[in-house]
C-alpha cells in the first residue's frame, strides 16, 4: 500500500531484528471516516471520543476477520509472494500464516481537519485545533498498541491515502447532512492529517503543522508540499525544503511540481489552456493530485 511503514515486528523470528523491514508490509486497512462520527456526536467532544473508540475496536475486529480469511488461502493464490521470499518467513508446513504474521493490520482515518471544524470550529492550523488533533491521534496510537499486545499481531496507525474514498465519503456525508461551511462545502474530505489544500500556508508552515502529528503513525504517512514550476531551476531552495522536512523528522516527504508541455513546440513550464510560446492548444498537463 502507498506510504507503508513497518514498525517493530512482534512476531520476529529468534535471531531476527524486530525492526527489519524487508519482506514485510501492510496486510489490510480499515479507514474510519471521522467527520461522520463528529456529526453523530452532535459536536460533543467527549461523545465523539466514545464513538471513535468504539469504531476503532470495530475496525480491529474487521481486520482480524480479514486476517483469518487471508491466512486460509492457498500459497498458490500469490505464489510469487511466498515462494521467492517477497514475503519473508514463509514455511510451507505452516501455510501462509507463517509469512503474514510479520505484516501489519492497519487502522486508517479520513478528514481530521473537517472533524475539528465540526467539534470546535477550527482546524489543526490553530493551537486549539492542534491540541485536540493530538488527543485524537493519541487514541489511535494507544489502541493499536493495546491490540498488538493482546492479539500478538502487528497493528498500526495508518494515514490513509483515500484517493477515491475522500470523494465517495463526502458524497454520502452531503446526502445525509447537507452542505456545512468548512466541512462539506467541497467535493472531498481532506486526507488523514493533512492541512487542507485551500489553507494559505507556506511549504515550511505545512511541514511545521503536519510534523507534529506524523509520529503518531507507525504504519505509514506522508507530508507533501506543492511548489511553482520555477522551483525546478532552484535546486538550492529545493534542498533547503527537503532538509527542513528531515530536520522535522518527517518520515516520508514529497514535493509536487506542476509540469505542462506543449506537444507542438516542446516548451515546458506551468500554463493553462494554450502554449504561451506558439499558441498551440495541443498541450499535456501533469499534476500530482494525491499523496
What role is predicted for each listed range?
Residues 1-101, 122, 126-284:
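Conserved catalytic cores of very large enzyme subunits
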